[in-house]
Amino acid sequence: WIIDLKSQKVLFHTLVAHGKNTGEEFANNFSNVSGSLKSSLGFFVTGTTYQGSNGLSLYLDGMERGTNHNARSRYIVMHGADYVSEEFIDENGRLGRSFGCPAVSRELEEEIIYTLAEGTCLFSYFPDSKYLSDSRLLDTEGLFALNQRL
């Protein structure tokens, strides 16, 4: 989900691939360690765009020490990927997986990346009890109430 909090509108509700060691079909195991090939949880701020080995990419700076602060040095960036599509799921039974990056479809990569570039807050969520108790940026009581409604 990509939500414009100012206008309170959903901009995108689309597929996103996670790191290959984060889980098979669903993400459930996260890391802040280089070489883990796992995605990270928590709050990020988007940086600039660049052309990398995966094409158009977006730098992500992790804002939570111990949870995702190594994102930039781990090269955790948002990028497009051919393995993020309904067709890939039909052929393989699930999305492909990245080396830890949030990867979006080639069809939407430009629109999503340029929408989020340069100073957008990005939040990667999973109901991980350690993250929820350690995060200094979350209102965990409010989040707990949200989880109860979902």
Question: Where in this protein do the model-derived segments appear?
Answer:
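Cell wall/extracellular polymer interaction/catalysis modules
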Residues: W1-F99, R106-T120, S124-L150
